Design a protein with these regions (language model features):
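A conserved acidic beta->alpha catalytic loop
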Residues: 43-53, 73, 103-104
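Non-catalytic, C-terminal membrane-associated alpha-helical segments of glycosyltransferases
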Residues: 239-290
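A short, conserved alpha-helix in the catalytic core of glycosyltransferases
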Residues: 160, 170-203
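Conserved nucleotide-sugar donor-binding
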Residues: 152-165
């Protein structure tokens, strides 16, 4: 594969893994690893899974460009971003690429080449690809400004993370990308979708459950807690920024519909309801630092 030229900015990648399908995860990693200067693999899996050995054996190439981080605990994503940010600061990386284990590039080389070219012109932008499963806007430009992103595929200049103070670990997983996007824009930077570059991103395992055949992600009670807590904190932290339509969408999807899914379709109803409402309470009482 063609390597990036010396004139390009120095690029650090970060991918988070949690009990992945190893062939799929390693295949996805090899689509972008050759075009990075270094990749941090943040392993949230239990140690007994022995993921490090299995993944590195499967990669076979470019393993000298990998830093592995994992101690058997699941720290989610925000601490991983901050680890990568501090590493980038200390080792003079210009850009940080964020990746999920399930995301698959069609042509990463062309994407990161355009990112590097645009970064050399202006350092005030965060870049992301077009994600068919998530993006609903009408494409009108090859570089189109947008207000949100998902973490996977997004490239953030280290200087922008310096300005906003990295990821807010009040959002370990859920609403983290929303919080980052809002803080980036509040600081005066833009989010630019490079729309001709496609990233296929898995949105989770949706199942039809219950007597009413309702579609649900069937999240664990702990994940339901995280979702209901984090979106309340997001609203309290950014209510001056969020539009009424954004607030309505969040309320409808993460609270009203989720409550109905628990009641009408999902198992362990009492445990799920307990964690769902505990998340709401903890989100309301969480101390906000703006």
């Amino acid at each position: 594969m063609e390597e990036m030229t010396k004139n390009n900015p120095k690029i650090l990648g970060l991918v988070t893994l949690y009990n992945p399908d190893i062939p799929d995860a390693t295949n996805n990693i090899m689509r972008y690893l050759p075009y990075l200067d270094l990749l941090i693999i943040w392993d949230n899996s239990p140690l007994e899974v022995n993921l490090k050995q299995k993944v590195l054996e499967s990669l076979t190439q470019e393993t000298d460009k990998i830093i592995w981080h994992g101690d058997g605990k699941n720290y989610c994503i925000a601490p991983a971003i901050n680890y990568a940010w501090h590493y980038a600061q200390e080792n003079d990386f210009d850009l940080i690429l964020l990746m999920d284990q399930d995301s698959q590039w069609e042509d990463f080389h062309s994407y990161i080449t355009e990112v590097a070219e645009r970064f050399q012109i202006s350092q005030g932008n965060v870049f992301c690809p077009y994600i068919p499963s998530d993006d609903t806007f009408v494409i009108s430009e090859e570089a189109q400004e947008k207000s949100t992103f998902i973490n996977s595929g997004t490239v953030i200049p280290t200087s922008i993370l310096n300005r906003i103070g990295g990821a807010d670990e009040a959002f370990p997983l859920d609403a983290l990308d929303h919080d980052l996007a809002i803080r980036i824009q509040k600081a005066g930077y833009k989010i630019v979708s490079l729309t001709k570059h496609i990233l296929q991103h898995s949105v989770g395992n949706i199942q039809m459950m219950g007597p009413f055949h309702i579609y649900t992600h069937n999240y664990s009670p702990q994940r339901l807690y995280s979702i209901s807590r984090s979106h309340i904190i997001k609203y309290r932290k950014h209510k001056d920024w969020l539009s009424s339509s954004e607030i309505k969408v969040t309320l409808k999807e993460h609270y009203i519909r989720q409550l109905l899914r628990i009641l009408l379709a999902e198992p362990q109803k009492m445990c799920r309801l307990k964690m769902f409402f505990k998340g709401i309470y903890d989100g309301i009482t969480f101390p906000i630092n703006i």
